[in-house]
Amino acid sequence: MAVPARRTSKAKKNKRRTHKGLTAPGLSRDSETGEYRMSHRISPDGTYKGRTIIEK
């Protein structure tokens, strides 16, 4: 079984983990309702790009 030859330092470990942070979701303002929603998703009222996808 492979065993590390040297202990990984805190600096080396943290440098490796710099890209693991969370990113905020891409929100855009809906032109019809004015609400914020995620891009490329159906709005809460069931429309997408001005067309009704889901009728309530």
From Swiss-Prot:
GO BP annotation list: translation
Pfam families documented for this protein: Ribosomal_L32p
Entry similarity comment: Belongs to the bacterial ribosomal protein bL32 family.
PANTHER family with a match to the protein in the record: 50S RIBOSOMAL PROTEIN L32, LARGE RIBOSOMAL SUBUNIT PROTEIN BL32
Keywords: Ribonucleoprotein, Ribosomal protein
Source organism of this protein record: Listeria welshimeri serovar 6b (strain ATCC 35897 / DSM 20650 / CCUG 15529 / CIP 8149 / NCTC 11857 / SLCC 5334 / V8)
Example of a GO MF term: structural constituent of ribosome
InterPro entries, A to Z: Ribosomal_bL32 (IPR002677), Ribosomal_bL32_bact (IPR044957), Ribosomal_zn-bd (IPR011332)
Residue ranges of the region described as Disordered: 1-56
Skewed-composition ranges (Basic residues): 7-20
Sequence ranges of Basic and acidic residues compositional bias: 29-38
Gene Ontology cellular component terms for the protein in this record: large ribosomal subunit
Phylogenetic classification of the source organism: Bacteria, Bacillati, Bacillota, Bacilli, Bacillales
Protein known as: Large ribosomal subunit protein bL32A
